[in-house]
């Protein structure tokens, strides 16, 4: 009950109207930003688009049949019903947290971010309908982001002698162009003219970065590729010259927030770095994750080496207000990633350290209990901050990182314990505690005080 009351109280306080006239713009005294890895990584984009296009009535009919007369359904229909339940549960989570702007990670698209079928379908057929007595929620502004996942490279990047152009031969791991993409929903206007994307920024152009080298042939069960040895460059010179830094994309999306003092612009800095696991003999995913995290540390430091997809150069302008958000796939204390890089970002002089590692960092009661119940990865149960974990891996992977010139009212991880409302969204006896019920990640949110 506490979780419901605290979220409701804060969400009610998030906005104040400047007048009773419906034509009068809303003035915000507070704003909630969030990130959520939705686990909508379907086998094809078309599958997800079809699920999102299903009307509310069609969803209900299928789910009722699945629960009451499953023998009348084919196996494919049963699988679809389970996925529809998952989507509805994800929508309910969003309706409970009620962000003003948030990242939707692992929301597949067409690769270019041009097809809005799935994005609009999720909004209109799920978020727009009450889920389990929660209030519907709407977002006027949506950003479908182009991605490098599954994007053909034309090279044998994994050195297995084949050029498949998908999975490990794609610029970012994906079974097709658009898998594991991300999107942004916002109730605030997106300043489209000043959006910056860095999909094509080259890894080689980050100062200090070099072609990866084979460090240990024993890192892979199959050893080093034929004709290669420790110390050799992993990527061909031609591939390295074209290698994008971002496994998906790095985007700077300015949001315009009306406040009593005038319009406030907050840069929503979003990415979803490669997970630092499934490494080859050059430790490629570890290094890729590290470099993708370093990107933001340098960007908010206004370093000059950046160029975006439109040719504009330079990092974020000094003094800008920002929120870095997304599934960063890195934990500063445990896990397989470069802990120093994520720790450096969390403790940057340009971020609100109290909100990243201090008393205002997002926490939950469900995190510690997740280990006790055996729902989270046991090997990480000795983490120093179980209340801050954001996934069933038992790691803190998902972040909302505000700039040092932003004030924070509150924050949290939507990870209810068994004694709190919403627990059915993180554990179900039939669906489990991971992607079956909602996701293997938990939604992280943070409330900004816009009066200061």
Which positions does each model-derived feature cover?
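N-terminal, active-site-proximal structural segment of metallo-dependent hydrolase catalytic domains
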Residues: 20-184, 213-244, 253, 257-266, ...
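Alpha-helical transmembrane segments and their juxtamembrane interfaces
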Residues: 14-15, 47, 337, 451
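Active-site metal-binding loops of divalent metal-dependent hydrolases
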Residues: 37-38, 107, 188, 273, ...
